[in-house]
């Protein structure tokens, strides 16, 4: 996994307070200073990127609550593509809201088959307003959600590889690639 994020937060050493817990029982092993880099609260955000992934890898652009309070943990998924969903002329692009620990949100995430070559540059964006999200690819609306997180969020860009998923004929040395041309944000609308 390789990921860039625009904010960072951890609780005290040995606490269970921190960002993006991927399983129960995790504890802070190393405190980090809190960093609120680019953490918008509403507005328009876009990333122009391209990726080369295999069936065992994926790439994503999402926004996550900084989790300074457990309930500020929802996510806005602007683009999530698993390599196994890529065909010659299309891919399934996941968009929506992930509830996680935010009781004010409902899980509302889906993958849409889009005619797209993800190895070419495309602009993935979201217009984020109170109670509303509108997702776009290259300026075309691909989805809407009638809810939204109501707190600052950090941006996250990541490429993930899952070697254990490699097929018998797959090149085990293949390295996924995510290239970002720009990240752009317009503050609160």
What are these regions, as identified by a protein language model?
Residues 1-189:
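GH16 jelly-roll
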């Amino acid at each position: 996994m390789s990921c860039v994020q625009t904010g960072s937060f951890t609780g005290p050493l040995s606490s269970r307070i921190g960002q993006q817990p991927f399983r129960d029982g995790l504890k802070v092993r190393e405190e980090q200073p809190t960093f609120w880099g680019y953490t918008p609260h509403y507005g328009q955000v876009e990333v122009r990127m391209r990726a080369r992934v295999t069936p065992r890898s994926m790439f994503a652009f999402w926004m996550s609550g900084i989790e300074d309070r457990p309930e500020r943990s929802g996510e806005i998924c602007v683009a999530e593509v698993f390599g196994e969903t890529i065909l010659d002329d299309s891919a399934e692009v996941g968009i929506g809201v992930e509830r996680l620990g935010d009781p004010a949100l409902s899980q509302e995430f889906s993958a849409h088959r889009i005619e797209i070559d993800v190895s070419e540059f495309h602009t993935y964006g979201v217009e984020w307003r109170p109670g509303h999200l509108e997702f776009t690819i290259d300026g075309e609306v691909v989805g809407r959600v009638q809810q939204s997180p109501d707190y600052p969020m950090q941006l996250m860009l990541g490429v993930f590889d899952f070697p254990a998923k490699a097929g018998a004929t797959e090149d085990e040395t293949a390295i996924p690639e995510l290239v970002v041309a720009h990240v752009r944000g317009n503050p609160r609308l």
